[in-house]
């Protein structure tokens, strides 16, 4: 039988349009066949009128090939097997853009580059069979550069009223309807004519943020498909271009998840700040900027300012590791008792535990002048005493007692009020 070229349906043109975005995300897609597994979920979210755009492209292609339009697109399977994938994608004259979507040829271009970090919170995630997967309730975005730090920010609550979410909430005047919010966001990230800048969010939030953007855009007369990329790819791209080395995604994620600024001032919106609520869409965006500044400032010789990180917290926690995991608590306690040279680390660790984020002090703040030889939780010492020989039982009665919030200053421990 003579060879026959595979027909192109609506799904083929949808996948072809998605290939540049998939490449920017670092996915190995050299042709349409490679991209099909990554596009099925986005295709399922499209409405019939949105799919009609790609169906029209398929009809025009068949007409140009001199073929009959044949049965309608609705009668064809969504994913048609491609017999000759190598013939389906036209050759590109230019190489695909790098991960960051920016030209990182020089340090100056990178330092002056503008980045937008975005996050959208939802009331929850609905089951897969529901047409509306998320209920957007809050949006935050910051304009950032390595040189200037956070240059501007945008924040708004999305009115969860009867017209959108069917969730009536009274006495909450800070919310706006979805059309107003998305139009204000457009004006924030694109105040002047020209190319729209790429927007970045964390990879774990990308599916939710991308869906909410498209959903909110349907309520507005202004339709703009924003280019949503991941912060992890941006950081990897910066390191790769600057140092010719690519850090692991796991390391980058840990870089963006530090907790030292969770309770810092001027990191949340006014409402969350006044009500002392940790979770805030604007705080997520500012935290991304803070983490990137803290990681790259010394590498590029940038002088940190309050626009880069909360300085009052950065200076106090400069020598304290924000996170610490002890895998073997028993061995750790024993090491602290037997090793005289371990006292410095012991004191530092005790200070870090005393500054667990409780609202009184930001996480990671180091309080100097507090020394303690307490060996940990009482249950640990109890188990040690049980396992010791009977001749040493009398030592248990002379052990120090664990620190508690009710220990008075006369026992050698300073209260929180005396440390401030």
Curated annotation (Swiss-Prot):
Residues 344-358, 392-407 have a biased composition (Polar residues). GO terms for biological process: cell differentiation; male meiotic nuclear division; negative regulation of DNA-templated transcription; piRNA processing; regulation of miRNA-mediated gene silencing; regulatory ncRNA-mediated gene silencing; spermatogenesis. It is found in: Cytoplasm; Nucleus. Gene3D superfamilies: High mobility group box domain. It holds the Pfam family HMG_box_2. Its main location: cytoplasm. This is Protein maelstrom homolog. It comes from Bos taurus (Bovine). The lineage of its organism: Eukaryota, Metazoa, Chordata, Craniata, Vertebrata.
């Amino acid at each position: 039988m003579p060879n026959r070229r595979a027909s192109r349906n609506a799904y083929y043109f949808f996948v072809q349009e998605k290939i540049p975005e998939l490449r920017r995300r670092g996915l190995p897609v050299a042709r349409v066949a490679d991209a099909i597994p990554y596009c099925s979920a986005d295709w399922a979210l499209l409405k019939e009128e949105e799919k009609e755009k790609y169906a029209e492209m398929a009809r025009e292609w068949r007409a140009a090939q001199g073929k009959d339009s044949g049965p309608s697109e609705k009668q064809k399977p969504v994913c048609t097997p491609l017999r000759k994938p190598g013939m389906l994608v036209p050759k590109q004259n230019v190489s695909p853009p790098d991960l960051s979507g920016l030209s990182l040829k020089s340090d100056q271009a990178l330092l002056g580059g503008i980045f937008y970090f975005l996050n959208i919170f939802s009331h929850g995630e609905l089951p897969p069979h529901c047409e509306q997967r998320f209920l957007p309730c809050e949006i935050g975005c910051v304009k950032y550069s390595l040189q200037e730090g956070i240059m501007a920010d945008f924040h708004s609550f999305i009115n969860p009223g009867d017209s959108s979410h069917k969730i009536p909430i009274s006495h909450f005047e800070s919310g706006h309807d979805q059309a107003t919010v998305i139009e204000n966001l457009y004006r924030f990230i694109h105040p002047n004519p020209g190319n729209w800048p790429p927007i970045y969010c964390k990879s774990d939030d990308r599916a939710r943020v991308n869906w909410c953007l498209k959903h909110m855009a349907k309520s507005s007369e202004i339709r703009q498909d924003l280019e949503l990329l991941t912060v992890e790819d941006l950081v990897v791209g910066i390191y790769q271009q600057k140092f010719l080395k690519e850090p692991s995604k796991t390391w980058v994620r840990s870089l963006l998840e530090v907790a030292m600024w969770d309770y810092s001032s001027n990191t949340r919106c006014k409402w969350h700040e006044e009500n002392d609520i940790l979770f805030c869409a604007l705080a997520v965006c500012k935290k991304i900027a803070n983490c990137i500044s803290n990681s790259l400032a010394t590498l590029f010789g940038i002088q940190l300012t309050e626009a880069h990180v909360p300085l009052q917290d950065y200076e106090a926690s400069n020598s304290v590791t924000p996170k610490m995991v002890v895998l073997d608590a028993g061995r750790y306690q024993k090491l602290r008792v037997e090793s005289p040279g371990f006292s410095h680390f012991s004191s530092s660790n005790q200070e870090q535990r005393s500054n667990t984020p409780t609202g009184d002090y930001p996480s990671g703040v180091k309080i100097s002048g507090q020394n303690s030889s307490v060996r940990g939780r009482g249950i640990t010492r109890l188990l040690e005493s049980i396992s010791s020989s009977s001749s040493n039982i009398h030592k248990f009665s002379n052990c120090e007692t664990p620190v508690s919030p009710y220990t008075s200053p006369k026992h050698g421990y300073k209260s929180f009020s005396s440390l401030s």
